[in-house]
């Protein structure tokens, strides 16, 4: 629900601030006073209309799914429009793109303009027919849940089958690609850590000649061993330390002779090159081994494709048969309730001085999560596109009222532009009664030209223009009677108009 509206520099409005309560809110005033300017200014904060306002700020206390749009929700969410060179939109001081704001706004605001017919979507009609059945048959809820569960399983298997059919078209090529990778990796047969070990070995090999020459010279020390020991003994010094040192040196010398490196250097280099190829292609030996495992699995999958296809086709046909049977039950149930829905809708259309609508159920070949049914709506054999904008808005109103009546629920904000324009008093009163009923579920904003609708309002705002400046103020009871009388008789208010206004107000 909108609690507060604030705007600045909106054409004739230098500043406007409105405190709003729940129910029906109407804006009245002379032609050209700025009602539409104010109305569009409010809608512009939700990106549902264009406006010249520099600032619009609206407080909404509904729980909204702002997190889906990357906005943190608060108890009171503040929608703000700022216009300088460009128009910018904010919710709770967090920036939001125009299109995202539009999509969000449509989840809790219904704007009855001539541009959209989304009230008459097939899904909405089917949901109402199903709701009528639920009122009589409590088991129908679980039936619908089972149908949707079966349809989701059916869709998943259908997608898997389509994927297999696509694979079959290029399965031989995929097999060859998988075999080629398996053969390449398997022929190299890499081991984890092997590449690093071979690089160390290669480094040692590159120093082999220098090492052999150096140790060949160093071995001459062993020829002096006896001479040194004899000198130590004559000097009465224990020679064991020298013997131990030379023994350790002999071990090092033997190890450095690289007798273990006496193998094919070309083979070593080829091995390093093959392992290097795998590392370049797969980033690591570990990844190459993982790819080998994956490609073996894929090859097995391709070779078992026909078996998988048969199994899926069997499940697909079983589920399709099950869904067809349930869809028939759905169709029969909806046909049974179709006249009841049509009657409810036509009761509201009659109240709105419109001709009866006819609803027909068409059964489609293709099955969906809603079944196979499509509801066709006609007004006195005329298609929706042939209705005037006024008729279309009243039809929308009748449908929303029907929805609230059947579901005993409704939530959000309803904006009605020129809903009672060019109507008789009787027609305006009928619309007023429907809106009064809807205001139990929705917060409603409307521009009103006739006293019948305005008399039913919970909030009545008068828009006036003095010179070039427009102003808006909330009317008290006495001011409302005067404004209703003006709407009846014009600027020269008669006593009869005052009495009529009082009667409207009392009723």
Curated annotation (Swiss-Prot):
The residues that the entry says bind ATP are 29-36
Task: Give the GO cellular component terms, alphabetically.
Answer: bacterial nucleoid
Query: What's this protein's function?
Result: May be involved in recombinational repair of damaged DNA.
Q: Which family does it belong to?
A: Belongs to the RecN family.
- Biological process according to GO: DNA recombination; double-strand break repair; SOS response
- The identity of this protein, by name, is DNA repair protein RecN
Q: Which organism is it from?
A: Campylobacter jejuni subsp. jejuni serotype O:2 (strain ATCC 700819 / NCTC 11168)
Gene (UniProt): recN
| Keyword set includes Nucleotide-binding | yes
